[in-house]
UniProtKB/Swiss-Prot annotation:
Region Involved in Mg(2+) ion dislocation from EF-Tu, annotated ranges: 80-83
One GO cellular component, as annotated: cytoplasm
Entry keywords, A to Z: Cytoplasm, Elongation factor, Protein biosynthesis
One Pfam family from the record: EF_TS
Organism: Tropheryma whipplei (strain Twist)
Keyword DNA repair: no
Organism superkingdom: Bacteria
GO MF annotations, alphabetized: translation elongation factor activity
Underlying gene: tsf
Protein name: Elongation factor Ts
Location(s), subcellular: Cytoplasm
Presence of keyword 4Fe-4S: no
Function field: Associates with the EF-Tu.GDP complex and induces the exchange of GDP to GTP. It remains bound to the aminoacyl-tRNA.EF-Tu.GTP complex up to the GTP hydrolysis stage on the ribosome.
Family: Belongs to the EF-Ts family.
Length: 273
């Protein structure tokens, strides 16, 4: 049998975060070759991660990075809040955020190359150490030159679970910050009415038409009634149409008009939703 030193076991543990026995057994299987042992443990980690892939991931955090011409927002999920607030998971989220900072989609983010192979491989290997399913669930890239980033903790003992990136033009940074906070709490899906997909609007119109018709409303006024009822949809889902959370007497559109700001785009993630 190959003589395995505790120094090699310790080195392997430090590199991969695995247990003493797993490290020792991998070194034995590799004939004492540390790099071969690393590959053995990585392969085992990837296989064990595959077994966990179907398990629900409703906890986790959001993390962001900001640059001169773009900002990125990512949601890294796990199974329990115990893991979500662990140092190892937090370190993983920071590493992933650094690695994917130039990606333009979730697919390209997962394919970014790193020492572990790819970001997807890195996450799978860390999932094996953490003992939970871990997933990079969402990723967004927001283009622009001025950004307001807001990260919100839903509980003081947890990492940020709501994240917003707002790209804007103008110089009222304080109001931009307030609007980013508004987005975090009001959860709009679209910037303007024109951004709502026509298919969604048409389905909503058809539904409201049938509801109004069922209520006995005259056929000739149904279009006006439906358009009036669509205002509620806009208030719920369109940023520019929403009432400002700091002053519900004005809409976000009016706030922007008064301050000379223009929202270019935004991204918002809430863990598990």
């Amino acid at each position: 049998m190959v003589d395995i030193s505790m120094a090699d076991v310790r080195l392997l543990r430090e590199r991969l975060g695995v247990g003493v026995m797993d490290s020792r057994n991998a070194l034995i299987e590799a004939g004492g070759d540390i790099e071969r042992a690393v590959e053995i443990l990585r392969l085992k980690g990837l296989k064990s991660a595959e077994k966990r892939e179907g398990r629900s991931v409703s906890e986790g955090l959001v993390v962001s990075r900001q640059f001169a011409t773009h900002a990125v927002l990512a949601e890294l999920c796990c199974e329990t809040d115990f893991v979500a607030k662990s140092d190892r998971f937090l370190a993983l989220s920071e590493k992933v955020a650094d690695l994917v900072s130039d990606a333009d989609s979730l697919e390209t983010a997962l394919r970014v190359r790193c020492d572990e192979g790819s970001v997807a491989d890195l996450i799978a290997l860390e999932a094996a150490v953490l003992g939970e399913n871990v997933a990079l669930r969402r990723f967004a890239r927001v283009e622009g030159s001025r950004f307001s980033v807001y990260m919100h903790r839903t509980s003081s003992d947890l990492p940020p679970q709501v994240g917003v990136i707002l790209a804007y033009e103008g110089h009222d940074d304080a109001t931009a910050r307030f609007i980013a906070q508004h987005i975090a709490f009001a959860a709009p899906e679209y910037l303007s009415v024109g951004d709502i997909p026509q298919g969604i609007l048409q389905r909503e119109r058809d539904l409201l038409t049938e509801i109004s018709r069922g209520e006995g409303k005259p056929e000739e006024v149904l279009p006006q009634i439906v358009e009036g009822r669509l205002v509620k949809l806009y208030k719920q889902n369109v940023l520019l149409e929403q009432d400002y959370v700091r002053d519900n007497k004005v809409t976000i559109s009016k706030v922007l008009e008064a301050t000379g700001l223009r929202v270019i785009s935004f991204a918002r993630f809430r863990v598990g939703t």
